[in-house]
A protein has these predicted regions:
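Sec/Tat-exported extracytoplasmic proteins
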Residues: 57, 241-244, 248, 293-296
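C-terminal motif of bacterial Sec signal peptides marking the signal peptidase cleavage site
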Residues: 15-18
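Surface-exposed intrinsically disordered loops and tails
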Residues: 66, 77, 185, 189-211, ...
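Compact alpha-helical subdomains of small soluble proteins
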Residues: 252, 259-305
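Amphipathic alpha-helical packing elements
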Residues: 228-270
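Bacterial N-terminal signal peptides that target proteins for export
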Residues: 1-7
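Acidic/histidine-rich, surface-exposed loop or edge segments in extracytoplasmic proteins
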Residues: 214-226, 268-272
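Beta-sheet ligand-binding and adhesion/scaffold domains
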Residues: 25-27, 35-80, 90-98, 104-192
Length: 305
């Protein structure tokens, strides 16, 4: 009798365990089904609007000249809006200004062909774009979320669609301005009055300038040697190096480099990190250029503007 009771209890335990397994398996299947539904991407629409739109980003700011009082004037910057994905309910992409890349999410109105695009909001420079599409151009405005945190809380923009394509042959054109206007340096100069013979010392502001070597040396195409670089100016080396990154669409934070490459019609900033896109020869050349930049010197001169 005892054996019979023991067998009955054992069978009951097995039955309960089996039910629990079935329940767990059913729940797991339901969860997996739910996960699959959540991960199914919404269908994309209007892929013809995908791409980079570049152009002027203008707003009024207080400008402080070297001489005279501050005044309010128009300040123009270069803006890139990159539209990556459009669905029925959402638009995804990123904005790039002054090398600062911010994601955005918004909506597209098919009836008016207009976008409302919001940056995340946790950076002081974040805001909302309200733009209208007209063929291959975007026009509209931007408003900062925190109007007291930025110099120009309201801006207008006029952008044209640009195709980004990496090309190792891209170079600065030979009519490019090679002066670094962003980093002037003061030098002590002497002046002798011809009438009195008295010599006086004064401070003169000078800017560094690159040489024509930047039009000839291409670190994306040729394997550089120490002989190629040993007599170059520091600014030469910096331009040759950063031309590599510009060809890959790097968004420069330093105004100096933006000034040089925005003179071209091929520079399209699309990312704030292109390290993984560099070719083996580019990586080797950048490493060599960095070594020479560390010890190179610049040539300064006086220039009117």
């Amino acid at each position: 009798m005892k054996n019979l009771k023991f067998i009955s209890a054992f069978l009951l335990v097995l039955a309960l365990a089996s039910c629990k397994k079935e329940s767990t398996a059913t729940a797991s299947m339901q969860n997996n089904s739910s996960d699959k539904k959540d991960t199914v991407a919404a269908p994309e629409i209007h892929k013809e609007y995908y791409g980079v739109y570049m152009g002027d980003f203008a707003g009024k700011e207080m400008i402080t000249p070297e001489i005279g009082e501050a005044y309010e004037g128009d300040v123009y910057k270069r803006l890139s809006l990159k539209i990556n994905r459009i669905t029925k309910d959402s638009v995804y992409g990123q904005s790039i200004v002054n090398g600062n890349q911010r994601p955005f999410r918004g909506i597209f109105n098919e009836a008016t062909k207009s976008f409302i695009l919001d940056e995340p909001g946790h950076d002081k420079s974040d805001g909302r774009f309200e733009v209208k599409l007209n063929n291959d151009s975007l026009t509209g405005k931007w408003s900062a979320f925190n109007t007291s945190a930025v110099k120009s809380p309201h801006k207008v923009l006029k952008l044209a669609k640009k195709e980004f394509a990496y090309n190792p042959n891209f170079m600065l054109s030979e009519n490019s301005d090679l002066i670094d206007w962003e980093n002037p340096k003061d030098f002590a100069e002497k002046y002798t009055d011809e009438e009195t013979g008295k010599t006086e010392t004064y401070m003169a502001s000078k800017n560094r300038i690159a040489s024509g070597a930047v039009f000839k040396i291409n670190a994306s195409r040729q394997k550089l040697t120490e002989k190629d670089l040993k007599n170059l100016r520091k600014l030469d080396l910096e331009i040759i190096k950063n031309a590599v990154f510009a060809r890959h669409g790097y968004a420069f934070k330093k105004q100096t480099y933006r000034n040089f490459f925005e003179q071209t019609d091929w520079y399209v900033p699309v990312s704030n990190n292109v390290d993984n896109d560099l070719t083996p020869i580019e990586k080797e050349n950048v490493a060599l250029l960095n070594r020479f930049i560390k010890y190179a010197e610049d040539k300064y001169d006086s220039f009117g503007r």
